[in-house]
Amino acid sequence: MATENPQTWALWLILSEMASDMQEDKKVAKILVLGPPKAGKTTLCTFLADFMEDGDTLKKGEDSGERERKFEFEFTSVYRPTKGVRIQEFETHEFFTEQEQNELGGTRRLEDSEIQLWDVSGDKKYEDCWPAIKENAEGVILVVNPEEHKGSDLQQWFYEFVEKENIDLSCVMVILNEQGAKKTNHEQISGFEILPKLRGVHHVAHHFGSEAMQVKMEVNSFMASVLKMDQRQMGSGVDHGLGYADEQEDDF
């Protein structure tokens, strides 16, 4: 690979080395968080990291809505684009509730294992790094802002990171990320056009400022489907995920 940007070249080398290390460690579930700029990908990853750090219980004296309200800052502050990729790591036992862990019993990495969320920049100038970012990925979360983006804005991300990498649709999730101080985008949500090839994928529309716990539950369910897919690939023969519709369309 050749690139005129030395910073991009250095990032590519680092990511390639990380991907190589992951091949030796089969206990890492790598999930890519993708989408156009200003979709809220970093907000999602930061939000999940906060829950992992603090746990699902409220801090002493914390109002029940405090955690949800503080994420409004992410939408109203100055936009800071991600440079290349940010990686959040979680232990599986930290990510899932006790009930979810029981439901996932028997998967090969329930204990002493990691989930990695790769928060990938929406800037196409990092495209040279995509091969290293893709390597060993097992799931994809596509994020869009329905006020700013269209379904077609996900087309290249879906093609490059899902279709070309043969990611099963049960391991793909689309989040319509409603931004702003309050939830008011019902018209944009209802009018958002889903790509034909993504109609078999689980779509959710959420507003972090008022629906934080629902977002966490949806992402947990998605992560469980990725781990269950891993178990099926090891020969369990159980199908818990979503799939393509009976009639697929050849083109977007």
Swiss-Prot record:
<dbReference type="InterPro" id="IPR027417">
    <property type="entry name" value="P-loop_NTPase"/>
</dbReference>
<dbReference type="GO" id="GO:0005525">
    <property type="term" value="F:GTP binding"/>
</dbReference>
<comment type="similarity">
    <text>Belongs to the small GTPase superfamily. Rab family.</text>
</comment>
<protein>
    <recommendedName>
        <fullName>Intraflagellar transport associated protein 2</fullName>
    </recommendedName>
</protein>
<dbReference type="GO" id="GO:0060271">
    <property type="term" value="P:cilium assembly"/>
</dbReference>
<dbReference type="GO" id="GO:0097546">
    <property type="term" value="C:ciliary base"/>
</dbReference>
<dbReference type="GO" id="GO:0012505">
    <property type="term" value="C:endomembrane system"/>
</dbReference>
<dbReference type="GO" id="GO:0006886">
    <property type="term" value="P:intracellular protein transport"/>
</dbReference>
<dbReference type="GO" id="GO:0008340">
    <property type="term" value="P:determination of adult lifespan"/>
</dbReference>
<comment type="function">
    <text>Component of the intraflagellar transport (IFT) complex B required for transport of proteins in the motile cilium. May be required for ciliary entrance and transport of specific ciliary cargo proteins such as che-3 which are related to motility. Regulates specific signaling activities in the cilia, such as the daf-2/insulin receptor-like transduction pathway.</text>
</comment>
<keyword id="KW-0547">Nucleotide-binding</keyword>
<dbReference type="Pfam" id="PF08477">
    <property type="entry name" value="Roc"/>
</dbReference>
<dbReference type="GO" id="GO:0030992">
    <property type="term" value="C:intraciliary transport particle B"/>
</dbReference>
<feature type="binding site">
    <location>
        <begin position="118"/>
        <end position="125"/>
    </location>
    <ligand>
        <name>GTP</name>
    </ligand>
</feature>
<comment type="subunit">
    <text>Component of the IFT complex B composed of at least che-2, che-13, dyf-1, dyf-3, dyf-6, dyf-11, dyf-13, ift-20, ift-74, ift-81, ifta-2, osm-1, osm-5 and osm-6.</text>
</comment>
<dbReference type="GO" id="GO:0005930">
    <property type="term" value="C:axoneme"/>
</dbReference>
<dbReference type="GO" id="GO:0008104">
    <property type="term" value="P:protein localization"/>
</dbReference>
<dbReference type="GO" id="GO:0005929">
    <property type="term" value="C:cilium"/>
</dbReference>
<dbReference type="GO" id="GO:0040024">
    <property type="term" value="P:dauer larval development"/>
</dbReference>
<keyword id="KW-0342">GTP-binding</keyword>
<feature type="binding site">
    <location>
        <begin position="35"/>
        <end position="42"/>
    </location>
    <ligand>
        <name>GTP</name>
    </ligand>
</feature>
<keyword id="KW-0966">Cell projection</keyword>
<keyword id="KW-0969">Cilium</keyword>
<dbReference type="GO" id="GO:0048009">
    <property type="term" value="P:insulin-like growth factor receptor signaling pathway"/>
</dbReference>
<keyword id="KW-0206">Cytoskeleton</keyword>
<dbReference type="GO" id="GO:0042073">
    <property type="term" value="P:intraciliary transport"/>
</dbReference>
<dbReference type="GO" id="GO:0003924">
    <property type="term" value="F:GTPase activity"/>
</dbReference>
<keyword id="KW-0963">Cytoplasm</keyword>
